[in-house]
Structures are given as C-alpha cells and as structure tokens.
Amino acid sequence: MKKQRNLRSMAAQAVEQVVEQGQSLSNILPPLQQKVSDKDKALLQELCFGVLRTLSQLDWLINKLMARPMTGKQRTVHYLIMVGLYQLLYTRIPPHAALAETVEGAIAIKRPQLKGLINGVLRQFQRQQEELLAEFNASDARYLHPSWLLKRLQKAYPEQWQSIVEANNQRPPMWLRVNRTHHSRDSWLALLDEAGMKGFPHADYPDAVRLETPAPVHALPGFEDGWVTVQDASAQGCMTWLAPQNGEHILDLCAAPGGKTTHILEVAPEAQVVAVDIDEQRLSRVYDNLKRLGMKATVKQGDGRYPSQWCGEQQFDRILLDAPCSATGVIRRHPDIKWLRRDRDIPELAQLQSEILDAIWPHLKSGGTLVYATCSVLPEENSLQIKAFLQRTADAELCETGTPEQPGKQNLPGAEEGDGFFYAKLIKK
C-alpha cells in the first residue's frame, strides 16, 4: 500500500524544478509517479502537464491576485497556488476539494503558516474570475508562450503563427506504429477493435494509427511482444524519405530512445543498423526498445561531431540524422519545452547541427541518402540550415523535399494531427 501523499504539493515542486532549475519533466515525473498509487499517477501527470501548458496564464493571474511575489524558500508556494488555479480553471475536480487539497499541500512543503494565504488567494480568484479572465484574454499572455518564441514564430510564419500556437496548447493525440513484421496495419486494427478500442489509419504513413482515446501501453494488443510502438505520425514520416533496404549499412545518428532505429529494422529487417547517441543514459532505452521488439543493432555511445572516434573510416548506404534541436514542434507533447528553452539556444543548436552535418557527410557512400530531420519549426534549424549546407557542399543534392531556395518539408504542429517536424532528403552525387 503506497503512502498517501499530497499530489498538489508534489506537482508544485515538480513544476518549480522545471521552471527554476531547468530540469526536464520527463526526468522528474516518473520517479514521483512511483511514489503514488496507480489511480493518482494520471492526476499527478495532469497537474504537472496542465500547469506547464498554461503557466503564462497562471503566472499572470497570481501577479494580479498578490501584491508581492513569493520568493526564496517560499517560492514553492507560488507554484502550489498555480496548481490550485489550474484545478479551478481546467479540471472537473469540485472546487471545494481542489481548494482543500491545495491548502493542505502547504503542510507537505513545510509551510503550514501559509495555509491562510493560499486559501485567500484562491477564494479571491473565485470571486473575481469573470473580470480577471476577460482582462487576461485581452493580453499577450493569452498565447501561453514565452515572448521570445512568439516573436520567432511570428517572424517565420506571419500567416500561420496563431494556428501553430493554438496547436501547441492542445493535448496531443496518441499515435502508434504497427510493426509490419508481425501484423499488417489492418489486422492489428481488428485486434484493437476486439480489445474495445478504436484506431484510425494515417493517410500517408503506412504503419501509423491514431487512437481515438489515449490508452496505457499495457492495454494495447501485443505491446509487450513488440507488435506496436508509441511514436508520433510525423516521426514515422522519416522512413518515407529514408526508404531503408535489406542488406544495407544504415546509421541512425542521435538515435535515443530508439524509435527510429526499430522502425528502420521493421521496414528492412536484414539491414545492418548502427545506432549512435551521445547520451549514455538514454542509450539504455534504445536497448530496451530493441529487446521488446526482438531486434538487433550495433549500439554505440558517441558524439556526432567526431564520427571517426566511433566508426573509423566506415561509410554507410543511408544515414538518418535526427539532429539535436529546440523541439519547438513537440510543445503540445512536452509543454516544459516552452520554459526550458531560451532564445540564445537557437543559434547554439544551429551551430551544433551544422557541425554534425559536416562531420558525418564524408561517412555517406557515393549515391547514398542522408535524411536530416528535426522536431523543430524554426527555419534556422531547418530550411536555412539545409540551404547553407547545400551551398558549401558540392556533392550534396536535395531530393524530393522542397526546392534549393526553400529546401525540406516542414510539417507544422497539428497538421494531420501530427507533431511539428522537418525533413530534408539529401543524395551524395
């Protein structure tokens, strides 16, 4: 029996770690969920994701409701009030229960003397909710994005930035990839139907299925046996451009957590795949995915900027470079990105991408294919990156994806219900 814990205080502390310490929610949340009962795991996730998704609004409201911000050791209370406001605004939790549990959270964070303050702020919001929300909806904070990112989106997409922002603020659908070595998509959809769930095939990506309602993976037919993998439709699009073939030597660079490594092997089971990532910890997930799907690949820890250190002079028939990026295309899936990224990160990431591209190109065979992919929507990391690479690389040729003036294919968040993603297919002359 798991000890009863105050979920509101746990959520407040998690959000504080993201915003104040720059930690990723995907690292913070799983250990916290291990401490609570199964029925509370989903609520804890909802509170953390929801507060981070609407952080601009909650911050704006607190500034209106309080004369002075909470600082120092009392800063966690600021986030606890956010959790309370989020429940009142966005959940079906009865207001009296939301208030009571949030106020009790002050004891869990060892600030019992502030219970009255928390209660007072939340009750004041209830009284003034209508006029506060009317004022908020006329402010720039209503877009729920940091101003630096909003400016970049407005500049890059003068006609589309609002729809991008809107898509980023939605909850994402759950996409799956059917393992074609086990089942056709249609036969697996029939199994899903028998299990009482409904799925929809993607029009363009042959293995992709969108669940009508997100479900825990253990409820999916054959998940433990590798029949299906959780992967967004846009990420699955990489295989359309890579087109791996049996017998080829293929490099998956920046491979963790291994979703694309295993997709290569589903499409071309007899390919010789090398999966490389700089992050040794995340490589454990590549091993886990290969094991669950019963597949084999050569997995290496290495820096994409220095390929000779981990592959010598080896050349590959195909290279998938899923480059490190701002992840601005997957904000709906990872709302903490809005608060982890900084404007100054973008030129630094673009420089890193450029260095990896230049370093890995000599390891592509003549006539070979390199697919450059990111989950970003920013031109500096995408079309401008590839345009500059083509200009300085005489034996590189753009293929099937865009034009030399506007290279690559950019999927925007929410288009065909997928994440924001960029692909460019390059051939070595």
Swiss-Prot record:
Assigned EC number: 2.1.1.176
Gene Ontology biological process terms from the UniProt entry: regulation of DNA-templated transcription; rRNA base methylation
Example of a GO MF term: rRNA (cytosine-C5-)-methyltransferase activity
Active site: C375 (nucleophile)
Catalytic activity field: cytidine(967) in 16S rRNA + S-adenosyl-L-methionine = 5-methylcytidine(967) in 16S rRNA + S-adenosyl-L-homocysteine + H(+)
Location, primary (coarse class): cytoplasm
Cellular compartment(s): Cytoplasm
Record's keyword terms, sorted: Cytoplasm, Methyltransferase, RNA-binding, rRNA processing, S-adenosyl-L-methionine, Transferase
Example of a GO cellular component annotation carried by this entry: cytosol
Binding-site positions, S-adenosyl-L-methionine: C254, A255, A256, P257, G258, G259, K260, D277, D303, D322
Family in the record: Belongs to the class I-like SAM-binding methyltransferase superfamily. RsmB/NOP family.
Role played: Specifically methylates the cytosine at position 967 (m5C967) of 16S rRNA.
Protein known as: Ribosomal RNA small subunit methyltransferase B
Source organism of the structure: Escherichia coli O139:H28 (strain E24377A / ETEC)
Taxonomic lineage of the native organism: Bacteria, Pseudomonadati, Pseudomonadota, Gammaproteobacteria, Enterobacterales
